[in-house]
Structure formats: C-alpha cells, structure tokens
Amino acid sequence: MMPAHGGDIGTAATAALYWGTRVRPVRFGRRRGHHEEARPVALEQTLQRIAAGKVVAIFRGDFGGMETDIVAAMADAGLTAVEVTLTSPDAIAAIERVAKAFGSRLAVGAGTVMTTAEVERCAAAGATFIVSPNRDVAVIAHSKKLGLGSFPGCFTPSEIVEAVNAGADAAKLFPASALGPGFVKAIRGPLPHVKIMPTGGVTPEVARAYLDAGAWGVGAGSELVNKDVMAPGGLDRLRERTAAYLAAVRGQA
C-alpha cells in the first residue's frame, strides 16, 4: 500500500522512496524579506575556490579603506580567497565592500568571528565563510544554518574531530607555527577525510610543506598583506609578492 500523504518532509521522503524517486534536502541561508535563500551552490563554490587557489589572504589591521584596491592587486596575481578579520577597524563595512566588488569571482570570508551575532552580521555583509581562532560549537552551527563555510580554530586532534562532528567544513590549524607540517601529516593518517588549513606564520616555503603533508589550504596574513601596501608602489609589490607566494605554493617557483 502506498504511504499516506502529509505535509512534512518525512512523509514526502517516504512517498518519494515508494515511487523510486529521490528527495534532496533543502538547505537555507540568509533571510530576504519573509523567505529564506537557499545557498548550497554558494557554499560549494566557496569551497571550490579555496581548494583551487590553496591560499586565503588575511586582512588584519587598518588599511585606510584600501581593501578593494588591495584585493584587486592580489586577484590580478591569481588569488581566489580573502578573509577580513573582525579585529580590523570598520571590518563589517570592509567585508561588504569587498564582497560587492569581488564576490562574483573570489571567496570572501570573515575572520576572528567568535559569537553567533557576529556570524549574522558577517553573513548580512556578504561573507560566504566564517573563520574563528577557537572552536565554538554554537558559532559552527549558526554558520551552517546560514549556509556559510565554517573554519573554526583547532589545535589538538580532539578539537579537530569535535569541530568536524559539529559541522565544520575545515579545521583552521592555529597557531600552525607551534605545530608544523609534521603535525598535519600525522593527523591525516587517522583522519584522512578532514580538511586542514594551517594558519599563523605560514611563509611560502612552509606553505608548500604543509600542502605536501596533506593540508587542504593555508591562511596567509602579514606574509602577504602588511602595511607596505600603503607605501608608494606598495600595491605593485603586493601583486608581485602574491604571485611569488602562489607560485611557491603551487610548486611553480
């Protein structure tokens, strides 16, 4: 006998199985008016962009409103992902400017996000992934509820497993300089399915070693984006520095 019809997803799924069809769950994101916006495509695109480029450039500090100029220089050099930390002055406005200008071709994220309220603000500004220095299950869950990528900070195998079990898309290994590529290689043995992104003190040479050890990508802060960009000729030097960093990471140097 065919199962009875009803209005809930469980009944719909049962009926679909009866007829040999398949129901895909709908994931929801930011509210627009009285509706929810489905964002699985945006999330998948974000993860693909980071995986393709291997490097997330991190803004931390005051760059005098030059964020879009800085991102343009790095994008010209081949960068595919950027993170603006909430410790930067006027960070939400900066995220919004960068997302509006580059969201169609770069993954634009927010860093140092430590509360669910901050997740909401970053999502509204256009961020498509959330990075934290710590592992907070509530922040992970809220990021996923809004259809955003979630990269919480982890330092131990237990924290990595707990983060992934809570729904994290990747574990930000932080501070990576205290652990090194050997840690990534060791952790990939029992946890080959986990995406690991070392961040903190990641020079081009060390970045290549992390990737060779099995890292999914790396986060680069002052190694790429620093106060030199505000000096005369700084954007040209940033473009060259970014190109050299990416070449080293991709084994082309």
Kindly give the residue locations of the regions a language model identified:
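Catalytic cores of alpha/beta
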Residues: T115-A125, E159-A166, T203-V218
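Hydrophobic faces of well-ordered beta-strands that scaffold small-molecule active sites
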Residues: V55-F59, V82-V84, V108-G111, I130-V131, ...
